[in-house]
Amino acid sequence: MNIDKYTIVGPNLNENQGLMTINGLAAQQNQYAPLAFANLLESVRPKRILEIGTALGGLTEFFRQISQEIDLPLDIVTYDITRHSWFDDLQAKGVADYRTKSIWENGVLESGICQESIDFIKQEGTTVVLCDGGSKKHEFNSAAKHLKPGDIILAHDYAPNIDVFDTQINGKLWNWC
């Protein structure tokens, strides 16, 4: 597994260190993300990833590349309310199933995650759920209700409150909240 090929843009947090490129696609990740995610995929070997919040698509591309490098068959479904033109090419190449719609049932946050995502999580084998959309706390709480034993749920860019963000995270791990 060659983690070195994933480049970081910007020499420090004040210059977007939290933005990296993967095959020319931007991913809003800090420099520790590639190794952490690669180790997770290699050690857990999940059957699928549900990504809530595609953003620019770089992290999705990274999941596909790592899964190919470690010979891991992996289904990836990713949701975002914004669709970029390059998602069509990535979907045609088999990177992921890009779904341009709300993760919420009928688009209503209070309704919980949509049934198709619940069905995806409940399939046999380990599912990794990455909560990285616009309401991580709600995404996490709603998706967690549907996890099977052994499934993993992650929240990206999460801080429990502004004080923790200001004192422990801002300028140290990432610089956005």
State where each predicted segment sits.
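A short alpha-helical cap/connector motif
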Residues: 1-177
